[in-house]
A protein has these predicted regions:
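Short, structured beta/alpha segment
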Residues: 1-135
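Long amphipathic alpha-helix in the N-terminal Rossmann-like dinucleotide-binding domain
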Residues: 90, 94, 112-127, 139-170
């Protein structure tokens, strides 16, 4: 079933599937935090976005929430004071089961397109993710950027490409 997000990201998916088929290296997401790639203000924008999370609730619209939990301490010596929702596991499972018919209805192209759009949006927030990884793991800046953003995004893309390839056989 055609889907606009699948069409939007088709070139990226095709390149990833080609790399899988040829068993070659290919990366969609730049591992160097270059302003030429990510934008001149990406570093400062990402830091500000991360800083806005400090001392706040990490609000997620999900069912079964019973409380907020906040006990994270940065390895760099300060309390992050970011609160995360605590949910009843069964409520989350039930919501997933309820969503399943919609995911089935949009077909493999729809599911793949949505996953690729998620990766594109995450990539645009790579500097924010890098600051979060750095401040929660203790990794240095470059490692936090590469491991927490483009490398993770490339591995996710690889998984999406494998899933698409297998579903396309059906």
């Amino acid at each position: 079933m055609p889907h606009p997000l699948f069409d939007k990201h088709r070139a990226t998916l095709d390149a990833a599937v080609k790399a899988i088929h040829e068993r070659t290296y290919w990366a969609a997401y730049a591992e160097m935090p270059s302003p030429k790639v990510y934008g001149e203000t990406a570093m400062d924008d990402g830091k500000r976005a991360f800083d806005r999370c400090l001392g706040q609730q990490f609000a997620l619209d999900q069912p079964g929430q019973t409380a907020w939990m906040s006990s994270e301490q940065s390895p760099y010596g300060f309390a992050l004071e970011i609160s995360y929702p605590v949910c009843k596991g069964q409520a989350l499972i039930d919501a997933g089961l309820q969503a399943m018919p919609g995911w089935q209805k949009i077909g493999a192209e729809g599911r793949t397109g949505i996953c690729l759009e998620i990766l594109e949006r995450l990539n645009k927030r790579s500097f924010e993710l890098a600051h979060a990884v750095m401040m929660t793991s203790g990794q240095g800046w470059m490692m936090a950027f590469q491991a927490g953003a483009p490398h993770a995004q490339d591995r996710a893309l690889e998984a999406v490409a494998y899933a698409w390839r297998e579903q396309s056989f059906v």
